[in-house]
A protein has these predicted regions:
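Acidic/glycine-enriched connector segments
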Residues: 1-184
Length: 184
């Protein structure tokens, strides 16, 4: 039996996007459509497992898309690696509800760190990157890095020489970066 092809999905923090947390904004809706399209293309190309670090931005969007696809593709898997068990405790109620629905519907849940561990979100990103064959990231490389977990995770993926598929959040363009080439 062939080893399943795994794709980690991540993105910049929602506040780095022009629309922030406003998922009703047309730009956010278009981004979600592009993300869904790229996930479906990856499925057609043989990706059968998607891994998320359970963040309340791109990770949640991707998980909801994959869970939706799983209703008709029972071989598709969503693997959720939470930074720690109480991650969503302080989230807004509407996000918390979606988070728990995501976890209820996923294939696997695993907490990466103990509650209170420093850099838990970064550790969760590193975990999914280590397990993945490639990384799908919603990321604007033209914005200066802030030192966030997301910035560090993308740099980590590059350092691990993972193939990257980048979606620009505003332009909705994609860029494929092979593991054999320099990402810059």
């Amino acid at each position: 039996m062939d080893k399943p092809v795994c794709c980690a999905v991540m993105g910049q923090h929602p506040l780095r996007f022009p629309w922030g947390f406003d998922e009703e904004d047309d730009r956010c809706r278009k981004l979600k459509m592009e993300l869904a399209q790229q996930i479906m293309v990856l499925c057609q190309e043989g990706v059968s497992q998607f891994l998320v670090a359970c963040d309340y931005g791109v990770g949640l969007y991707a998980a909801e898309i994959v869970n939706g696809l799983r209703t008709t593709d029972h071989d598709l898997m969503l693997l959720c690696y939470t930074p720690h068990e109480e991650q969503a405790t302080k989230w807004a109620p509407y996000l918390r509800e979606r988070y728990f629905t995501m976890l209820e519907k996923c294939t696997l849940i695993s907490a990466v760190c103990e509650v209170g561990a420093p850099d838990a979100q970064l550790h969760a990103y590193k975990k999914i990157i280590d397990l993945a064959d490639m990384v799908l990231a919603v990321y604007d490389r033209d914005t200066p890095p802030t030192g966030s977990a997301e910035d560090k995770a993308l740099a980590y993926a590059e350092g691990q020489r993972k193939s990257l598929l980048l979606i620009h959040p505003a332009e909705l363009t994609t860029k494929q970066i092979s593991a054999a080439h320099d990402a810059r």
